[in-house]
Every structure is written in C-alpha cells, then in structure tokens.
Amino acid sequence: MDFKQYIRVIPDFPQPGIRFKDITTLLKDGPAYKAAIQDLAVFAREVQADVIAGPEARGFVVGAPLSYEMGIGFVPIRKSGKLPYESIKANYDLEYGKDALAVHVDAIQPGQRVLIADDLLATGGTIETTINLIEQLGGKVVGAAFFIELSYLDGRSKIGEIPIKSLVQY
C-alpha cells in the first residue's frame, strides 16, 4: 500500500520552517491504519521481538496496536514525571526543542528482545534516548519501526546497526 497518500503535510507547524507530517489522516482511515500495523508486524516478527516499546505520545498509537497484533506486551516510554513507580530517565533533543523520557525500572527484563515503534524518525534524538533507556534495563533492541522517516535529517546515524523499517520516506 502507498501510505504516503495518507500523510498530510502541514507547513510552518509547530514553528516556521517545519513541514509537519500529520499521521491523523492515516489513523482515521481504518483499512490504511490496519495495513500499516500489519506491515510493521511482519518486520517485528522477522526480528523476533518479545515486546514492543513506544515513546510518548504518538509511539503509543503505533506501538500499542502493533503489540496487540502480535500478541506481545507493550512498554510505554513516558515523558519525565508521568510514571507512578520507580523509573529511570534520560534527556534528549527534539527536531524543534528538548525533552526527557522515562521508563519503569521493571518494564523490560534483562535479555528481552525489544522493538521500538514510533510514528516518525527525524533527527534520531527520541530513538537514541529510547535505546539508551532500554539498554540500561538490560533489554536488547532488535529493531525500530516507524510510519514515517525524514531521511534528510539522518536519524539513522544515531541508531547504529539496529534494523529499521519505515513505511514512508521523505
């Protein structure tokens, strides 16, 4: 399926010069959304993921249905200060700002094979931080799956040898 036709591009959002890739047009189309999740599930099975991790917030709308499709667990990687139990956190740079992510200390078991799922790979700051958190807990990141990749921002350079699947590239 050509998923690019389901992505709306919004100029100058959230600030001038940014061309925001809006996935809500994909999400609202049931057959396209389902097909996107199923395509990513093929990749997740290939890398033999034990669990899916998704960074807040749009990683939840990719990762949770992906884990459901596969019948495996989902680990939410939250914004700092949002988790009620003991957690670890790490700071990172966004395409247009700064933030911090956190995960519960018992969310991932040592040796667990983790696939990271998110809507977008841009500069790589979010994925690099998510990998860092998972590895701190002893997890093995076996892949990263995205609806969209902004290849001109070279986020792949922050991932190393981890296999990547992106449905749409800009």
From Swiss-Prot:
Gene3D superfamilies: 3.40.50.2020. GO terms for cellular component: cytoplasm. It is found in: Cytoplasm. GO terms for molecular function: adenine binding; adenine phosphoribosyltransferase activity; AMP binding. Keywords: Cytoplasm, Glycosyltransferase, Purine salvage, Transferase. Its EC number is 2.4.2.7. The keyword GTP-binding does not apply. SUPFAM superfamilies: PRTase-like (SSF53271). The keyword Transferase applies. It catalyses: AMP + diphosphate = 5-phospho-alpha-D-ribose 1-diphosphate + adenine. Pathway: Purine metabolism; AMP biosynthesis via salvage pathway; AMP from adenine: step 1/1. Belongs to the purine/pyrimidine phosphoribosyltransferase family. Catalyzes a salvage reaction resulting in the formation of AMP, that is energically less costly than de novo synthesis. This is Adenine phosphoribosyltransferase. The lineage of its organism: Bacteria, Bacillati, Bacillota, Bacilli, Bacillales. The gene is apt.
